Amino acid sequence: MAELTISSDEIRSAIANYTSSYSAEASREEVGVVISAADGIAQVSGLPSVMANELLEFPGGVIGVAQNLDTNSIGVVVLGNFESLKEGDEVKRTGEVLSIPVGEEFLGRVINPLGQPIDGMGPITAEEDRVLELQAPSVLQRQPVEEPMQTGIKAIDAMTPIGRGQRQLIIGDRKTGKTAVCIDTILNQKANWESGDKNKQVRCIYVAIGQKGSTIAGVRHTLEQHGALEYTTIVAAPASDAAGFKWLAPFSGAALGQHWMYQGNHVLIIYDDLTKQAEAYRAISLLLRRPPGREAYPGDVFYLHSRLLERAAKLSDDMGAGSMTALPIIETKANDVSAFIPTNVISITDGQVFLESDLFNQGVRPAINVGVSVSRVGGAAQTKGMKKVAGNLRLELAAYRDLQAFAAFASDLDPASKAQLERGERLVELLKQSESSPQPVEYQMVSIFLADQGIFDVVPVEDVRRFEKELHDHLNSATPQVFEQIQGGTALTDESKDALVAAAKDFTPSFRTTEGNNLGTEAPVDPLAADDVNKTELNVSRKTAK
C-alpha cells in the first residue's frame, strides 16, 4: 500500500488559487415592513426610494401599488388577498410600474385587470407588456373624427351619430338599457369583422366594473351566441373584487386597446360603468386618508376620468391611422344629470346619449331622449346617405313631443296638427328596436326615407315594426340594385328613390294588419277638403246673418 504524502506547497497553492478567484456575492435591496393592513390598504414603513405607482411585493406573491408617499410611511393599494398580510411582513420593491400583457391572443377571452385569464380556457401567450398608465396621444398625433362607427341602432346612427375615435357618453338611470345599447354596437361590428378588411374590422373591449358575476356571464353568453366573442375581449372586475381592481379595470382595457390602436387597427371600448369606478376610487382615497371634496370624492376624480377618456383618439396617418372609440356608461339617480360625476364626464366626452326611465316604461326602447342627446363631432362622420334622409328627423320628433304635450290638454286640434301627431307616433314606433337586433345602415336609410315619403302614414301604429320587416323582405327581392347602390351609406340617387317608393306602394295594399284587414290603396281623406271648407263658411255666414 502506497503511503499518502501531503505536500504543504500544494495545499498552499490550492488555497491561493481559490481565494484569488473567489468573489463575495453581496446584494443590496430596500426592504419595508407592513405597519397595518385592512380594507385592501396596507401602510408600509421604509422603502425611501419607492416611486409613485410602483409595484411592491408582499409575502405569498401578493402585489400592491404605491399610492401615498408620506415622510414615514407608504399607503399601498393591495391587489389580491390582503387578509393574509400581517404586521411585520417584509415588503420589497420591484422597480416596475403596473403593466399588463397584450396581444391578439386576448380576443375571445375573459381576463381580470391584471391580464390574467379567468374563463377557464387556459393560459394566454402575450406578444408584449404595456404600461397601464400610458400617456394619451398628443394633439399633433391626432386627426379629426371623420369615419363612422355604426351602432346598428336607428335612433343613434340617424340623430346622434358616432365616429371612430370619438368619446360618446351613454347616460341614464339603472335598468334603462345602457348596457344593451353598447352590446348591440358590438354585435353590429360582426359584418365588418367577417369582411377581413383591416380598415373595416373593429376589435371590441368590454370592461365590466362592479357588475354582478351573473351579468358578466350573461354578456359573454350573448356575444358568443351571436358570434361576436371572437373579436371581443372582456375585462372583468366584478362586484366581489376589491376596490383596487375596480379602479384599475378601465386602465387595463385602455392599455389593451391602445396596443391595437398603435398597430393601425380600429378599437371600440366600453366602460360599464365609470360611476362604480369613481365610487371605488373614492373608497380607496378615503381609506388612504386623502381629503374629501364634493360628495366625498377626492379632488382628482376629474383627472381620473379625463386621463382615461383622452386615450381614445383617431390617430394621424403618420401614426398608422388607428382609432379607439370609447363608450363610457354613467348611471344617474332619478335622471339627475347635474350630479358631480355625470357633469364631469359630460364635460370630458364628445356628446351623450341620454336614456330616460319614463320612455323605457312607456315601451320606447331604446329609451333615447332625442332632445337631450347630442353628438358634438359625430356629424362629420355620419354617412352622406344617412345625413340626407335623416336631416329633418330630429326636428320632426321634437315638434311631435311638443305637440303631444299640448294635445293632452287641448280638446280639438286642427288637421295639420293631427297629421303631425299621427306621423310622430309612427316615427317613434319605427325607431324602436328589439335587443340584440342591430340593423345595417342600408336598411336604416330605407326605413327613414320611406317614412319621410309618407309610406308608413297609413299603417296602424301597432303594426309599424312588422310592416317594416315585411317591407324590407319585399324590397330585397324587388329592388336589390338599390341596396347595392347605397352599400355602406352612399346617398340615394333619384332613380333609387323612385324605385323604392314604387316598390313600397306596390307592397302596401297586400299588407295584412293585426285586425285582419288589408291596407287600402286610397289616400286618407283630408278632413278639411274644399267642400267641407265651403260648408263651414256657409254655416258661419248664416249664423252671422241671424
Swiss-Prot record:
It catalyses: ATP + H2O + 4 H(+)(in) = ADP + phosphate + 5 H(+)(out). It is found in: Cell membrane. One of its GO terms (cellular component) is plasma membrane. SUPFAM superfamilies: C-terminal domain of alpha and beta subunits of F1 ATP synthase (SSF47917), N-terminal domain of alpha and beta subunits of F1 ATP synthase (SSF50615), P-loop containing nucleoside triphosphate hydrolases (SSF52540). Its EC number is 7.1.2.2. The record marks 373 as: Required for activity. GO terms for molecular function: ADP binding; ATP binding; proton-transporting ATP synthase activity, rotational mechanism. Keywords: ATP synthesis, ATP-binding, Cell membrane, CF(1), Hydrogen ion transport, Ion transport, Membrane, Nucleotide-binding, Translocase, Transport. Residues 511-546 are annotated as: Disordered. ATP binds at residues 172-179. Signal peptide: none annotated. CDD domains: ATP-synt_F1_alpha_C, ATP-synt_F1_alpha_N, F1-ATPase_alpha_CD. Coiled coil: none annotated. HAMAP family: ATP_synth_alpha_bact (MF_01346). PANTHER family: ATP SYNTHASE SUBUNIT ALPHA, MITOCHONDRIAL. F-type ATPases have 2 components, CF(1) - the catalytic core - and CF(0) - the membrane proton channel. CF(1) has five subunits: alpha(3), beta(3), gamma(1), delta(1), epsilon(1). CF(0) has three main subunits: a(1), b(2) and c(9-12). The alpha and beta chains form an alternating ring which encloses part of the gamma chain. CF(1) is attached to CF(0) by a central stalk formed by the gamma and epsilon chains, while a peripheral stalk is formed by the delta and b chains. This is ATP synthase subunit alpha. It comes from Corynebacterium aurimucosum (strain ATCC 700975 / DSM 44827 / CIP 107346 / CN-1) (Corynebacterium nigricans). The gene is atpA.
